[in-house]
Swiss-Prot record:
Catalytic-site annotation from UniProt: C405
Keyword Iron-sulfur: no
Cofactor-binding details, from the entry: Binds 1 NAD(+) per subunit.
This protein's name: Urocanate hydratase
Listed GO MF terms: urocanate hydratase activity
Organism: Streptomyces griseus subsp. griseus (strain JCM 4626 / CBS 651.72 / NBRC 13350 / KCC S-0626 / ISP 5235)
Gene assigned in the entry: hutU
The family this protein is said to belong to: Belongs to the urocanase family.
Amino acid sequence: MSGPRPVRAPRGSALTALGWQQEAALRMLQNNLDPEVAEHPDKLVVYGGTGKAARDWRSFDAMVRTLQTLKQDETMLVQSGRPVGVMQTHEWAPRVLIANSNLVGDWANWEEFRRLEALGLTMYGQMTAGSWIYIGTQGILQGTYETFAAVAAKKFGGTLAGTITLTAGLGGMGGAQPLAVTMNDGVAICIDVDPRAIERRIEHRYLDVKADSPEHALQLAVEARDARRPLSIGLLGNAAELLPRMLAESAPIDIVTDQTSAHDPLAYLPLGVDFDDMAGLAAEKPADFTRRARESMARHVEAMVGFMDAGAEVFDYGNSIRGEARLAGYDRAFDFPGFVPAYIRPLFCEGKGPFRWAALSGEASDIHKTDKAMLELFPENESLHRWIRMAGERVHFQGLPARICWLGYGERDKAGERFNDMVASGELAAPLAIGRDHLDCGSVASPYRETEAMLDGSDAIADWPLLNAMVNVASGASWVSLHHGGGVGMGRSIHAGQVSVADGTKLAGEKIRRVLTNDPGMGVIRHVDAGYDIAENVAADQGVRVPMTEGN
């Protein structure tokens, strides 16, 4: 069958390909488009505005067909969501190499990208959409949870109880915000223009209730705040209208951030445009739509700055809304920081980042067993134990059961090897796909997000994600990806990802040990090179070799 159709990854231990590395890539590609997982599966859009798993349905079918027949010493090459070749390599090489959305510098902008996309020559891969390791909203949940925990520690005595957070965006990424806030015992008002997004987050248990109006939302929020009761509230509307209104009315807001699809102006609803007319207007008049969207973002960001001036804790959550507002002429757009320099960079210095794994069996029990193994492996990691317990109780699986937790250098390899042993012993029903977000300690160059305000000024140096991709290829990852524009939009980021399959074999164990040591090791090295003392101490303690620090 050609064209849109429901897609669901196979379950169980029976192979539909010639080996588990190929089978894992096949299942994770299909899982990205599972209706439980993808935001708009009929359009091949997984998350992040227009982040796709395949360029078109013909390309999707060709990738499925190729993966089913790919040999153990062959590698499929994917160019922006289309399979363009199969090469004979060797068993240590990745089974798939992926390059998505990459453009030469002077051409790296949305206008040129859209021209090429209209010609059928490229696609937007976001981060984990085109690299086939998206696991639904859980994929960003712990990072969002840890960010709000850091806000609580910095400003509110270690808890968000008794506070109200105001934010917008309830898509695949932003949908993690309400649960992340309530996991920290706070109250959240979450705005979105799409009623379906609000309903989907309630259905998946990330969002508690929907308010009838801004006044109703504030009433619910204040009641819950005063009772120190966690609550997340969905509010239908345009943040560019509602935030200025709430600011003018002196709404009692303690924290403000945003996760709308501001990275792509065509995915941000301008003031004065009905949501139902959005797609048509964006397609018919993209330049005018972009101008109006940026003007609306400027109003949105101006209100965020206003809340900051009034005493709220305000931060950019990495969607480039400050950059877009500045393009619209708002001079104070960068008065508040991004979340990485404000809260996350010390973790990056330790090689910590979003480690994730998916049960290819489709059995939730496999994830529960790996949860138990994680608690046994790291008995003294209190934050990990708290997270695993909360995730087990509150996280709804989308598609293949999966788990995410932030692990650092010297931890990821231990977890991966333990998982491989569990597959080998038969404790798990089938192999695991072990990967991560491209948002990681050593795999991104993104001056508006992961590498904002680097100590040595190296925000825009893009050698690091390229080195990261090459290191993962050399170390034996099952598939490796190199993308452009994820998270913050065209011209603003280069980033790499890897997935390694734990199939229980000795070879898989050797690969996993190398990949899951070297991949986070790149984060330590990158931050040592930038002059961070924490990273230098980790490198010294853990034996990470950095030639420029040797022989001094």
